[in-house]
């Protein structure tokens, strides 16, 4: 897999590389609200719609899964047709999901609306990643610096935004905050005009991958959801069949949704492991930390959001630094150091239940999230042919989001048998894996 071809002129921003990075970050950033901000609203959702806690949890689970699938699917659409087509169709899907969520009369309709909304939000994330990856090599580091700084601000401010909208307005607005990406779409269309390759989309493969991911997440939450034995067996069979079908699809088709050449790329596999560790640690922390601060330290939701805001500053600075360090060992060592520091903070939180260590752990998770996007986008952009970058980055981010779903699902399953603070010590294994895997990325990026 090669390449570092210069981007077509149509993809270069006339307003400068840093401005382009900010616009692409504004396109991607609101997707973060779909999980972290929405989590703040779950108690109000359950009360208003008379839903059980396990049913309300699907407001987050369905969103995380659909966001990953949408990112991969619209990434392939961008490669096949154009980034512009992907953004326009995704905008329609995102707007439709927003309307469904705002008018949903019950929890089932709301979950369906969130699935639609997240699928459209996936078009925004894949578009932002594809635009960043398609920039000229000499501009890419500056674009990625601005991109990473912007999404760091969104990620750290998500809980505060969720608290403000839920407390002062309505939980329904909190659940549709990802629709803010629509405001950035017109600012990115000019750069998204390049035509795609025209290769067909493998919708069958996409469906198999979606079913496999959903079955896997449901199996992890078997205990928490109280699923009967028959349902568990059915899910296990579905997972086995969908994985088997996907493997057959990969081996039998050159245009499969998951390209064989991508799976054989060491850089892709190592980047996936790194991102899964970071996202799983962050999602698990965002499940537990706000609840601990509210229940045990008696913080208000607004105080939790405000306390996590410094993470925006840390993440913005570190992601800009990572953007300048791409192409060598510096960026991978930076990410490894951040992930390792998160491990220490999570273990300290489990041991002491100190509020400061809880805030630091979550803030480091935000920083690792932003830096991971910068490093993995730069790494894959230099190795993947431009005509396949959108799909490759979409699939990579699908693994990240499924990893995040695994982290929150494990934390949710363990909460029935142990304290939230103890859970933090267990989920620290995720950023530990990321810290070790990140060290292997530097050699691949040279």
Q: Which residues does each predicted region cover?
A:
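Short, Lys/Arg-rich, polar N-terminal cytosolic tail immediately upstream
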Residues: 1-16
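12-transmembrane solute porter fold
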Residues: 16-79, 84-97, 110, 119-120, ...
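Cytoplasmic-side transmembrane-helix entry/capping segments in multi-pass membrane proteins
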Residues: 87, 140-151, 198-208, 263, ...
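Membrane-embedded alpha-helical segments of multi-pass transporters/permeases
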Residues: 99-103, 186-191, 244-247, 347-351, ...
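Alpha-helical transmembrane segments of multipass membrane proteins
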Residues: 99-100, 160, 164, 218, ...
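Cytoplasmic helix-loop-helix junction between adjacent transmembrane helices
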Residues: 115-151
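Glycine-rich segments within core transmembrane alpha-helices of 12-TM secondary carriers
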Residues: 145-159, 399-407
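Hydrophobic transmembrane-helix bundles of small-molecule transporters
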Residues: 163, 167-273
């Amino acid at each position: 897999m090669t390449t570092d071809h210069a981007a077509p002129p149509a993809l270069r921003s006339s307003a400068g590389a840093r401005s382009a990075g900010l616009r692409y970050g504004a396109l991607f950033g609101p997707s973060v609200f779909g999980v972290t901000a929405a989590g703040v609203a779950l108690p109000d959702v359950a009360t208003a719609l008379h839903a059980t806690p396990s049913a309300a949890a699907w407001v987050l689970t369905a969103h995380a899964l659909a966001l990953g699938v949408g990112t991969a699917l619209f990434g392939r659409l961008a490669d096949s047709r154009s980034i512009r087509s992907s953004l326009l169709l995704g905008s329609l899907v995102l707007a439709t999901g927003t309307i469904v969520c705002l008018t949903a009369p019950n929890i089932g309709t709301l979950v369906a609306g969130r699935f639609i909304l997240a699928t459209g939000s996936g078009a925004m994330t894949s578009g932002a990643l594809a635009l960043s990856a398609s920039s000229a090599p000499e501009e890419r580091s500056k674009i990625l610096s601005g991109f990473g700084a912007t999404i760091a601000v969104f990620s750290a401010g998500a809980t505060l935004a969720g608290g403000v909208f839920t407390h002062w307005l309505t939980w329904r607005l909190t659940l549709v905050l990802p629709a803010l990406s629509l405001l950035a779409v017109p600012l990115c269309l000019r750069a998204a005009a390049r035509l795609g390759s025209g290769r067909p989309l493998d919708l069958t493969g996409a469906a198999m991958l979606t079913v496999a991911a959903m079955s896997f997440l449901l199996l992890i939450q078997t205990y928490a959801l109280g699923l009967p034995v028959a349902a568990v067996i059915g899910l296990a069979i579905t997972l086995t069949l969908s994985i088997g079908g996907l493997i057959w699809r990969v081996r039998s088709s050159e245009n499969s949704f998951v390209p064989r050449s991508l799976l054989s790329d060491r850089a892709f596999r190592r980047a996936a492991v790194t991102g899964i560790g970071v996202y799983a640690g962050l999602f698990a922390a965002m499940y537990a930390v706000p609840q601990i601060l509210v229940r045990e330290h008696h913080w208000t939701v607004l105080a939790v959001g405000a306390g996590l805001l410094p993470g925006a500053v840390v993440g913005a600075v570190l992601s800009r630094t990572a953007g300048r360090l791409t192409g060598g060992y510096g960026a991978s060592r930076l990410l490894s150091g951040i992930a390792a520091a998160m491990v220490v903070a999570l273990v300290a939180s489990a041991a002491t239940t100190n509020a400061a260590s809880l805030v630091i752990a979550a803030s480091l998770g935000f920083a690792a999230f932003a830096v991971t996007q910068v490093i993995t986008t730069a790494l894959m952009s230099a190795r993947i042919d431009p005509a396949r970058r959108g799909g490759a980055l979409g699939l990579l981010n699908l693994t990240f989001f499924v990893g995040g779903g695994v982290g929150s699902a494990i934390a949710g399953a363990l909460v029935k048998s142990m304290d939230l603070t103890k859970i933090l010590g267990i989920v620290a294994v995720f950023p530990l894996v990321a810290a070790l895997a990140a060290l292997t990325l530097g050699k691949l990026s040279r």
